[in-house]
Amino acid sequence: MPRPFSVALPPWLTHALRAQRGPVPWNAVLRGALAAGPLLLAAVLAGRESVGVMAALGAMLAGINDRPGSRRTAVHRIGVPGLAGATGLVVGTYAGEGLGAVPLTLILTALGLLAGAVSAVGPVSSGAGTQLLVAAAIGAGMPLPEPGWQRALFFLAGGAWLIVLRLALPTPGALAHDFRFDGERVAVADVYDAIAELLAAAGGEQAGARRAALTAALDHAQDALAGPRLRRYASSSAERRLRAQYAAALPLAEAATALAWAGDALPARTAKGPRRLAVAVRTGEPCGPLPAPARSVPGLRALDDALLHAAETFDRGGKQTGGRKPGSRQEIDGKKAGDEHGAALHSDTGTNPLDRGARQTAHKGLRLRPLRAKALLRTVTGPGGREYGFRVALCYGASAAVAQALHHVHWYWLPATAVFLVKPDLGPLVSRVLNRAAGTVLGALVFAGFAAVLPRPEGLVALVAISGALIPVATRHFAAQTAVVTVLVLALVMVGGEPEASWSRIGETLLACAIVLIVGHLPAPGQRGGNVRARLDAATDAAHAYLTHVLSGADDRAARWALRREAYRKLAEARAAIDRAAAELPTLARHTEGTGEVAATLERLVDTTTACAVHLDDTGRLTPRHTERLATLLDELVEQRERAGLADPPADLLSA
């Protein structure tokens, strides 16, 4: 029988065709519909179309940053880039009015260097850098009657309006509880679901993927609960309960990781306890009896102890119905109440290491240490920040120079487009160029068709509202997002009094794509792949700190869990950067060859360290399997880092 014909696509093309999956975020769709469109309508009715254009632009860019998560996190994720965008508008407007083409290009290039370097810090900083540069180009080139400070205020008002909608509108089904924390509640419940999925996958081929999914769920919940607040500690019982439930998930995640590392399949009942806890988080009801695993190996004993601790935590914070506490020791399904080890563990819940660590984590915070100014400065000025800043500055400045040389009325489109193309943390360069070109052509053609038949300005306002509603769905693929944003921006341009510009928009975008492709592949000073190398070094340091703590025999569970979370978070960031770099064209991808193997070894090292921690808690000593595995992984790490051209790992890591 002939084999089916298949074609292996290159990584850069595979990435360009890949789209995110998931349910439609209807609450974000509603916010998008109520954001830019109504603001523009109010301005049109008041006869201030230019004001409406600025406010709608602020709301549109805020909508791109309106992602799932808690309300507090949304304020930070939307507000910080909005402030950066307002700053860019002020700088761009006054620079465009008072400077010639050459000094203006130099100013924009310097802004690109700064914004690119800052973008290496993280997603929020990257969003701020993007809005700073886009708004600076718009301020310098878009002809509007308002002075720079007024443009900035109206731009901020658009973003602030979306924040108000994010804070005020409850998500579906959230009114049954304190809807202020619906995002946190979903995030914590997802952690327990991810633990159950990992336990169910133990011993199978999907265990590695499930462990990565657990890391993502823990990162998301940690960010949701550690969002910006006016007070240092949780101020409401609902928030304190969620923080305690998150802290109770950490020993469960640790035990599940150790069991997955062991490689043995587990009975189906092992995953039922975390699933019931996930339901309890979502509903606010007691968790009920939890099936207890057989206490036959250290990992299962750790899982059992963590389940008992979680049940007690949920009982203290959940709704009580009288009588025996659901989930208490007497009702643990299949558990003998006389188990000596468990009785000793829970005889004094205030002094055992597990309970003490959970209380410290829930009370003092979920991060190992807050970001300090020196650490941020090191990231910005380090190899990753320098490479990022140089690449963005070169493409942004070159686009601005070419655009002004062409004397096009919409010259600001060229540098603004380059910003969305060149930022490495947003995706591979060639993938974004292909999607940007395709999305712009599609969006411009769609808008040209609507502009020919819609009444003005009411039809254009409706088009802005519909496009705003589609942004949360379109963000799953860059081409779709580009098409929707193109329609929205072209509608705003016409409402502002300029002629229909679909065809010039296509030409400007294709020119920007060509500039970025050429400039982005030019030789750069220093070693390429600096962002990947910097993140791998950070992951290596975090893995080293975690391994050192575990092997020291310290009994501080809160510190151990924080170090473990830090190690897995840094590894996830490094893995994401490596995957993006691998999807570049071969001329760029070759600079990070071998880094994927280093990340995989570090992941196995952290998994093994977790298994060692669980075993040391149970027996106080490691087995030959643990020590031999650690030695093998450390030797592999040295060899792989050498092949990838990375610096040697810390000497004390190798001597561990």
Regions found by a protein language model. Give the residues of each.
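Cytosolic regulatory and coupling regions of membrane transport/channel systems
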Residues: 1-30, 34-37, 162, 166-409, ...
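Alpha-helical transmembrane segments and their membrane-interface boundaries
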Residues: 1-132, 136-163, 296-325, 329, ...
